[in-house]
Structures are given as C-alpha cells and as structure tokens.
C-alpha cells in the first residue's frame, strides 16, 4: 500500500486519481476555505491550512508527494539556479518537504506557462532544485483532450524518483467523450443559468460559421466568439463567464466537474461562484489516473532468473 500526501490539494483531484489504484493519503494541505469545504465533504478530512504554517518534519512519512503548486517567480538575486533560489515561494515548501521526508517519488502539476515563465528561468530552477535533491526527473505537457474528456487543457506534469528509474509518460488515447454525454438536459437546468435574449443574439451574431451541436461557445477578450464540440480550459477567473453551452446558458457546477473527470457522486456543497473557481483550479482526474504507473515503478514488481529486478515499463501497459 502506497502512502501519499496531497499538497495545494484543491478539491482533491490528484488524490482521487491515485486512490483509485490503492493509495492511502496521510496528509493534505489547502488554504482556500471553499476548496477545503468540498474536500472534507468528499474525503472525510479537512486539509491543513497554509503550508507555511507546518514544519516539514511534522508531516507523516509517505511514498509519493502529490502537488499542484502555483506558478511564481523566483528571486532575481539567485545565481545558482537551485534550491536557495526558491526561498519565499510555495515551491520552496515542496522542496523542503522532499528534502526532509525523502519520499520515493513525486508528481507535480502546473500550468503550461511554467515552462516559459520568466523566459524559462523559473522552470530551470524547479528542475535543477529537484535534481539537487537527488531525484531523477521527467516532465511533459499533457492535454486533457487527449485523455478522454472534451476539454482542451494543457498542463505540465513533473515526475521524479529517488532512484534512477526509467519512466515514460502515458501516450494520448486521441479520443474524448462526446460533449453531449457530459451536459445536462436544458429542461433540468434552473432558469438562472440561461442568458438574456440580448446576450444570446449578440453572441450568435459574432459567430463566423454555423455552430456544431452540442457545443460550448467561447468569447475572447476581443469579442470574437467560437463554438467548439469541446470546452476550452476551465478557468478560475472572470474569463470563465465566457463559456456558454450552445450559446444559451452557463455551465452548471456538475457539468464543470464532469469536464474535469469527477464522478457524479462527488459532493458539491459550496456556492456556484466558488464551484467555478475550484473547478477551474482543479486537475483533470483521467490525466492523473493515466500516470498511475508511478505506483508500479516505486517498488520492484518481480525478479528475473538472474535475480535482477524488472520494473514496469511503458510497453507493459
């Protein structure tokens, strides 16, 4: 049984993906009160608050560290591209825990922009820090659209092992569920979700071609409207208001969580405005599930006749 900790946990999407494969979570941390409220309702425990308020040595021993950490700039005073450059950021908390607890593996998730942030310097510091801590590190940008969900959402995933273990990221399945399977019937949606006739006509007039059905309409800052058979990336900020189902209504809270791969029995116990935020900040569960091979790689699966350990490889999937 593998033990995990869930840092910057949000509503628990990473944990959910790993628990499906037998992992037991022993510690969680999240500062947003609404995300903590949802997390407690679904996992039976309230995450620790601000990670800055806990000593890394007080965190339980674990095999895998899981974290979806914020993208922050590092100090321009740093010259070494390493651990000391990360002080004052939330990534430093992750590095401190890795240094203190030395788990066998980690999975980190971040926005794709991390790779180019500060002309790539931020990402170089992250990778160098992890390597300085003794980990073999792998990274890749994965798109939710390639793993079964109708949402175009690119995120960087960073995997590390304390041993020199070969790792291969999952290959895209190159298909996704039809959008219509995730949308609720308009007849079952409350009237408050529907747009006024004026807004509907405005967006319809901005379309350059006939929309597919069903579709999610996205209006960018410039006022251009596109209608797609999948959703653009769910976002926590105000731009989220520009995603409209078939040009007539907003996404419901349940639809948002479905677009992130959460099951329908996942409880929603916070206001709609906060559901938009926590859903936009969450991870896509199927992408996390696709990285489950981390568990298989942690410990030798079997030995061959010569006594050498054989590890799970990509072609064993």
Swiss-Prot record:
Keyword Transmembrane helix in record: no
InterPro entries from the UniProt entry: C5-MTase (IPR050750), C5_DNA_meth_AS (IPR018117), C5_MeTfrase (IPR001525), SAM-dependent_MTases_sf (IPR029063)
GO biological process: DNA restriction-modification system; methylation
Active site per UniProt: 71
UniProt keyword DNA-binding, yes or no: yes
Enzyme class label: transferase
Protein name stated in the entry: Type II methyltransferase M.NgoBI
Species per Swiss-Prot/TrEMBL record: Neisseria gonorrhoeae
Taxon lineage: Bacteria, Pseudomonadati, Pseudomonadota, Betaproteobacteria, Neisseriales
Encoding gene per record: ngoBIM
